[in-house]
Amino acid sequence: MPKMKTNRSAAKRFGKTGSGKFTRRRQNLRHILTKKSAKRTRRLGQGALVDSANVKAVSRLLPYA
């Protein structure tokens, strides 16, 4: 059986923690930032975990993560 391919776009967007959870970046931090408060932009700069509903899909895209 041939090797499975990693989805490269997903590999650039998601990471995996030591405990096996997937991390992601938050949205809304690219542009139109002037109307967003400093507190909000700080919070958006922190990473987040992938929701449990999407873990199976992400793990299929990243078979070797």
UniProtKB/Swiss-Prot annotation:
PROSITE patterns assigned: RIBOSOMAL_L35
One annotated Gene Ontology cellular component of this protein: cytosolic large ribosomal subunit
UniProt record, GO biological process: translation
Organism: Solidesulfovibrio magneticus (strain ATCC 700980 / DSM 13731 / RS-1) (Desulfovibrio magneticus)
Keyword line: Ribonucleoprotein, Ribosomal protein
InterPro entries xrefs: Ribosomal_bL35 (IPR001706), Ribosomal_bL35-like (IPR021137), Ribosomal_bL35_CS (IPR018265), Ribosomal_bL35_sf (IPR037229)
Protein name: Large ribosomal subunit protein bL35
Highest taxon in the source lineage: Bacteria
GO molecular function ontology, one term from the record: structural constituent of ribosome
Family to which this protein belongs: Belongs to the bacterial ribosomal protein bL35 family.
Database matches in Pfam families: Ribosomal_L35p
